[in-house]
Amino acid sequence: MLKTKQEYQIYWATHHDVVATTPEEVIIYDMIDEMANDGNSSKFRENITKWVLGLTESKSKHGYDDDKMAIEVKPQNITREKTKLTGGGNFNDLTWRRHRKYLEDELLILQSGFHHGKLVYIVEFPYASIAPVLEARLQDVLPNGDVPKVYDRWGTFKCQDWGQHPYKVRYLSQDFIHYQPDISKCLREKLVQQLDESIIQGKMLLSTLNLL
C-alpha cells in the first residue's frame, strides 16, 4: 500500500499503466503527471532517477546533484511524437575550471530517459567518457581559458560519446518493449547489449522496489 508522496511518485513513474482506485488517487496521479512533464523543471525526474537507485534527494542548492557523492543527473524526457530518447544530455554552465574539477572528482553521470514522465532506463558512466566532446566545445567557446561570466551553454553529449566506453545500465523498465520504438538505434543497442550480457551472467537489471 502506498503511503507517502515519494512512494506515489515512484510508483507512477515506474509503471506504464497506472489505475487510480479512489477519487483521491485520481487527483494525486494528475498532479504527478503535471510535475513529471514540466518542461521548465527537471527536479521531479532527477529525484525519481536517484530514488530508484536508493539515493536521496539533494538538499544543497549548490554543487553536485548528490550531497555525498560526485554525481550529476541528466534526465531526458520526450513528450512529442517523432521524438526519440537518445541517451544524451547537456551542461549549460561549463567552464574550464568546472571541467577540470569534474575530472578530478571522478564525477559520475546518471543519464536517465523518460517517456511522458515515465522512467524507461538509467545508465551510469564516468564524466571522463564524454570529456573529449565537451573539451572540443570549450575550445570553441573559451579558446584562451576562462573568462568571467562566460560559459559554454551548449555542452551536449549523446549515446555515441559514452557508449564506446565502459558504462552500466542501472535500471530498465519492465515495460521496455513498449518504449523501444521511441528509443534511438544507438541507445537501444547499448541497453539491449547490457541486458543480454546480464541474462547470460544470471543477473537481473529490472528494478525491484520493496514498496511495490
How would you name each of these model-derived features?
Residues 1-69, 74-212:
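Nucleic-acid endonuclease domains
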